[in-house]
């Protein structure tokens, strides 16, 4: 999978019923985040935290959906553990992928993987630790891949969403460590002539190729 490609569509069972992925996304943004196996410690903390901050994603018109290489029944049992240990049960669907179809479709597992998922260990599925941000156009905007031992920073994913949505709308780029409200950079695809029309007050330019303006509202 590469940034800019169309996210593969699929049908799958989830903890909230069967979905067709592209139809489920609709006109929203979406985050698909995957897990190597149910009842694993790091992922338990992640699923609980995503439930806690889901209102922040909803405020940004972003739907979130999990995936784990187990059955929907296992997911529902796991959800009880998540609520009891993290204080928040998943309030978003989790895809059941016991036949590895979605994991293989997205290149998270080799095409020749087969067999009973219950006989596989988390280490067997170690590559299923990805985050995909998908736009309303169904294109992949961002991919993050984490090792099993490092919990994902979903506050950072919120920051990334803010940057992706801002830059998609205004033809700007966000500099290092940017946060909402900070100055931004006029995209290189915008000529100086066009930039003068967009930013009649001008811009700061420590170099001709670094054109800094306040964040567009």
Language model features: what each stretch is:
Residues 1-217:
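Chalcogenol-based redox active-site neighborhoods
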